[in-house]
Design a protein with these regions (language model features):
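Loop-to-transmembrane helix boundary motifs in multi-pass membrane proteins
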Residues: 125-134, 141, 377-416
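Membrane-interface "cap" regions at the ends of multi-pass membrane proteins
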Residues: 4-71, 182-185, 198, 217
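Hydrophobic alpha-helical segments and their helix-loop junctions in multi-pass secondary transporters
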Residues: 31-36, 144, 148-152, 160-169, ...
């Protein structure tokens, strides 16, 4: 037991100590926030009292999860080369800058006026429809599961290389840690830890990109090499792959830009950040910070994914399949970034990247779990029981946080694959359900209850129809269907609203002030 660690064990022990220190800080934050999370508003929105930096980092770390670094960056960086940076540009401009500029102030003002804490509460109050509250809560709870499970993916090789632990041990550890500090401190603990994790992610991205381009002669040399036609896959013909793709590459790329950039406009876990900011005066600063954070994270991740073309040959799929003994049907590109980040960099850089991916995973998992728990505790339980007190709702929310983490862990342990398509599936279903009713509800007084219900159902049914007819999530055309699920309600809501009875004038005056 007291023997000197071997050469391989010594760095793993040092890395383990770093992770333990990191975990201790997370738990300390959770414990410190317990006293301020006793009310429903305190637990779920930190009392609507977060400053601009905390709000911006909470938004950014929720937006860019481990799915980006492990799934999107690898698969899309390999599939599109430098063209994948168009996705990063869309994420920065539309997903961050315009999201804060257009929606934050109006959302903060209107939800406070309606006393709405959640997306289902807002839709029900804005459209005077209890049905929307129930339907929205069910959509959130059901369709956040695939995305939550996908957050765990890709951690295995990074943990095995740096800490010598298995995939199962890694994700159980992450789930337990997330559950403990989230159950203790709620959204306030999440915001504090997101700020810390955001700093870790920024440092990790800079170190990762700097080292990798150094291996290829610097940023200019690496970028020049990536602009070579052989390193930038064509977008006009269909992308190679099985099953045969249904759309040209540029259509798939455009769909990915759309769903990852405009999808956050209707995702409850993203919109929540607008509810909780302290004042409207803080929104401009939060917008700037969130946008700058997105520049570093999005461009760093997709640029790193494109760099894989300079380190691997065209036979990368066969290489990864053989190296990791992958069974038939398992996409080897899900292993591209983990292999890349554990075999091409020294131990200290790999450990930095591990903390980056670990931080991104916990940030997204926390936000998803909290929003899902609110759907049950606030929207279903408190919505059905007029006598429900704040203490019982908070207690149920804590229980549901634990339950939802357990469900997502079960799915992840049963090897749910296709990281990118899982994310696209959940984003398509949720954003397709909420994007149009939410946006029209904020800005168009003429939007009606019937229009909102029709819009929600049309988006959801579009996505479900595609899943059934095209056997998603394995089909690579899922991003195209997700984009359609978001676009269809944009047309349906105004058309149905114009042909149905206008909302009550007094109610609209109260809603819009």
């Amino acid at each position: 037991l007291l023997a000197r660690p071997t050469t391989k064990e010594a760095p793993q022990l040092a890395n383990l100590l770093i992770v333990i220190a990191y975990v201790a800080v997370m738990l300390g934050i959770g414990y410190g926030c317990m006293r301020r999370s006793g009310t429903v508003s305190g637990f779920f929105l930190a009392g609507r009292n977060l400053g601009p930096w905390m709000s911006a980092f909470a938004y950014g770390t929720t937006y860019f999860s481990a799915v980006l670094f492990v799934g999107y960056a690898g698969r899309l960086g390999w599939g599109f080369g430098m063209h994948a940076l168009w996705i990063a540009a869309g994420n920065v401009l539309f997903g961050s800058l315009l999201a804060w500029w257009i929606f934050a102030r109006r959302t903060r003002r209107m939800t406070a006026r309606l006393d709405a804490l959640t997306m289902p509460q807002f839709l029900a109050a804005r459209y005077q429809s209890p049905f929307l509250r129930l339907a929205a809560a069910l959509v959130i709870f059901v369709f956040l599961v695939p995305y939550t499970a996908s957050v765990y993916q890709g951690l295995s090789l990074l943990f095995q290389s740096n800490l010598g632990v298995s995939y199962e041990q890694a994700i159980v550890f992450m789930a337990l840690l997330t559950g403990v500090y989230l159950i203790m401190g709620g959204y306030l603990a999440l915001a504090f830890t997101d700020f810390l994790r955001g700093l870790v992610e920024l440092v990790g991205v800079v170190v990762m990109v700097a080292f990798l381009v150094h291996l290829k002669g610097g940023f200019t040399a690496a970028t020049t090499a990536l602009t070579d036609p052989h390193a930038a896959p064509a977008l006009l013909p269909p992308l190679p792959g099985k099953p045969a793709p249904m759309f040209p590459g540029w259509v798939t790329l455009l769909s990915l830009v759309f769903i990852t950039s405009f999808g956050p406009w209707g995702l409850p876990q993203m919109v929540q950040k607008f509810y909780s900011i302290k004042s409207e005066d803080d929104i401009r600063r939060a917008m700037i910070v969130a946008s700058l954070f997105s520049v570093f994270i999005a461009f760093g991740a997709y640029y790193t994914g494109a760099l894989t073309h300079l380190f691997y040959g065209a036979d990368v799929k066969s290489f990864l399949t053989a190296k990791y003994h992958l069974p038939a049907g398992k996409d080897p590109l899900d292993y591209l970034m983990p292999d890349f980040l554990t075999t091409k960099v020294p131990a200290v850089v790999s450990m930095t990247i591990l903390l980056l991916v670990f931080s991104a995973s916990m940030s997204s998992l926390s936000s998803l779990v909290l929003v899902s728990a609110s759907a049950i505790a606030i929207d279903l339980y408190a919505g059905a029981r007029a006598d429900a007190n704040s203490r019982s709702v908070v207690a149920l929310m804590r229980v549901m946080c634990g339950a939802f983490i357990a469900i997502s862990l079960y799915i992840a342990l049963n090897k749910i694959d296709f990281i990118v398509n899982l994310m696209a599936l959940s984003w398509g279903a949720i954003a397709g359900s909420f994007l149009a009713p939410y946006c029209y509800g904020l800005f168009w007084p003429r939007a009606t209850k019937a229009g909102a219900i029709a819009g929600m159902l049309s988006g959801l049914l579009t996505m479900l129809w595609f899943v059934e007819t095209h056997k998603a999530p394995g089909n690579p055309a899922v991003p195209v269907a997700s984009a359609l699920a978001m676009l269809v309600p944009v047309v349906v809501v105004p058309v149905v609203s114009l042909f149905t009875k206008p909302p009550d004038a007094a109610h609209i005056k109260n809603v819009f002030g």
